[in-house]
Design a protein with these regions (language model features):
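N-terminal secretory signal peptides that target proteins for export/translocation
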Residues: 1-6
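Bacterial N-terminal signal peptides
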Residues: 9-20
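Boundary at the C-terminal end of the N-terminal hydrophobic targeting segment
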Residues: 25-29
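Extracytoplasmic "Venus flytrap"
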Residues: 34-50, 72-76
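Short, polar/charged alpha-helical segment
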Residues: 42-68, 183
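Contiguous mixed-secondary-structure segments that line small-molecule binding/active-site clefts
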Residues: 54-55, 86, 91, 96-183
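Short beta-strand-to-loop elements that line the ligand-binding cleft
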Residues: 67-76, 175-177
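Short, hydrophobic alpha-helical packing/hinge segments within bilobed ligand-binding/sensory domains
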Residues: 78-82
Length: 183
């Protein structure tokens, strides 16, 4: 089920991109881009969707738009994808804003936020609350345009050996977070 929903979402997104970027494929010359990835294609959902996205764009454009997916490290290290796109050494990147925090401190707000809003609330903020516009303004300072291609639900961040009853119980506790932990 999850795989079918993901494929449908990627198909719709890719269709929109093809019409915006390519238009009439027969009247266009071929565009070939390199897309560096921060995720290996064998990683469920976020990794496997990169090559699917590339292939769908190629098919729907009749080959006029060919974005070649590169595994992490093939063009640049995984955490350097954003910088490679900003500098022009790759035309596209398959990454997450959470990996851009060193360059853009606000970037994690455009990805999964630990203990943050649920998926519906987050998508509403992006679309109706100015989230996309804010992201576009921030990324434009680096010459990059971000497109939200996939949504990962917020991290619950917690299977613990003992019950958490107060903030004091969190002191010294180690928890994994993808981009940054709340202060």
């Amino acid at each position: 089920m999850r795989s079918s929903v993901l494929r449908l979402f990627l198909l719709v997104l890719a269709s929109a991109l093809v019409f915006v970027l390519v238009g009439d494929a027969s009247a266009q010359k071929k565009v070939r881009w390199k897309m560096a990835s921060a995720f290996t294609s064998s990683l469920d959902v976020v990794g496997e969707s990169g090559p699917i996205f590339s292939e769908n764009l190629r098919k729907m454009s009749g080959g006029a738009l060919d974005i070649k997916f590169f595994e992490p490290g093939a063009l640049v290290p995984a955490f350097e994808v954003f910088n490679a796109v900003a500098k022009g050494s790759a035309e596209a990147g398959w990454t997450t804003p959470g990996f851009h925090v060193a360059t853009i401190p606000a970037a994690p707000w455009f990805t999964t936020v630990p203990f943050g809003p649920n998926t519906g609330e987050y998508l509403a903020w992006l679309k109706y609350g100015g989230g996309h516009q804010l992201k576009d303004e921030i990324y434009a300072r680096h010459g990059v345009r971000g497109i939200s291609c996939i949504m990962i639900t917020p991290e619950a961040s917690g299977w613990f050996r003992k019950e958490i009853k107060s903030v004091d119980d969190l002191k010294g506790l180690k928890m994994p977070f993808s981009a940054w932990a709340p202060a």
